[in-house]
Amino acid sequence: QNHAGWLNFLKIRASYGEVGNQSGIDRYDGTQFYKFESQSGAYIGPNKGTIIDTNGKIASLGREWERIKNYNLGLDFSLFNSRLTGTAEVYMKRNDNMLINVSYPGVLGDNAGMSNNGKFRSHGWEVMVNWSDKIGKDFTYHIGGTYSFNTNKLTDIGAVSVLKSGFVDKQQGYPLNSIFGLRYAGKAQTEEERQKYLYRFLTGNTIGLTEQNFRLGDNMYADVNNDGKLDQNDIVYLGTDDPKISFSFNVGAEWKGFDLSLVFQGAAQRTIFRTGDNNGNEIWRIPMKALYLNTSNQSVGNTWSPENRGAYYPTYSNKNEINDYNYQASSWSVEDGSYIRLKNVELGYTLPQR
C-alpha cells in the first residue's frame, strides 16, 4: 500500500466447503410396506379372497445424504481513495452422489425410490463493481453493477441418454432444465416444395407429419442425422430454461437534499418453451388454437398466405393434429428469454435538520 497510493485495499480469498442435502429421502424409505386388498369374484369360505401387495414403492437401504462440494476463489479490492470498490469470484460445485429417480423396466411392477446415481457439475464467475464520487460541494453520485455467468451439466444419471422432445428437467450430458426439439427448416412455400418434403419424410416419421394435415405454409424440419427419416434421432439440444447470464446495474445521485436512484436488472442466454393446456401457457405458443379462446395478438397479420409468404406463423388452425405438428418443440417454437428491465426508481427529498 505504501508503494501504490491508488490501492487502498486488496484481499485474495479461497474457500472449500461441503454441504449435505436429504431432499428425496423419506423417513421410512428403508422399510418395505405391504397392504391387504380384498378381491372381487369367488368367495373363499365366508369371505372373498384377500391378497397381500406392496404399497407401490420398493424399499431402499442404500440411499444417503448428498455431499455437495463447493470451491470458491475471490478477490476484493478498493481503489482511488475507495471511490472504486468491487469483488470478483470464480466458483465450482460438484455433486458425485446426487439423488435422482432411476428408471427400471415396467415389468418390475413398483416404483423405485431415489438413488445416489447422479453426478452433477456447476461452475461460473461473478463480478461486482461500484464507483462513487463527488462533484463540487453539493453533488454526489454513484454507479455500479453486477454480472454473473453460470453453467452446469448433469454428467451421469446412471441411465441410457436418450433425448426426448420438450422440457426435460434432468438429461444426462446436458444442463438441468434443458429443452430439446427439432431443427426448423423453413416453411413449405409452394406445392412442389410440399410434395417433395412429403415424399422424403412421410414414411416412417414419428413427428406427426401426415399428408392430409400438412398444408402450404406449414413448418418443415431438418433431417439432422441424414438417415432419410424424421424421428427422435433428429432431436437436438435447444437451450436451457435457466439463464446462464444475470446482470444488474444501478445509478444514483444526491443534490441539496434531493436523491434519485435507478436499478436495472436482466438475464440472458435463457431459452423458453411454453407448455401447458388451453388454460395455461399454450395459448401464448399456439395462437387461435380453439374457438372463443383468449389468445395474444402478436400473430395478427403475421400468418402465412400466398400473399404473405414471409410471415412468421403458419395459417391459423384449431385442429389439434396440425397445431401439434407445427408448434412442437423446435428451434422455431422456442423463444429467447433474454430481457432487461427497469426494476426500481426512487426519487426523494430529505428535509433539512433544524
Regions inferred by a protein language model and the residue ranges of each:
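Conserved small-residue
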Residues: 26-28, 36, 115, 132-239, ...
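Solvent-exposed loop/turn elements at secondary-structure boundaries
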Residues: 2-67, 85, 89-120, 158-164, ...
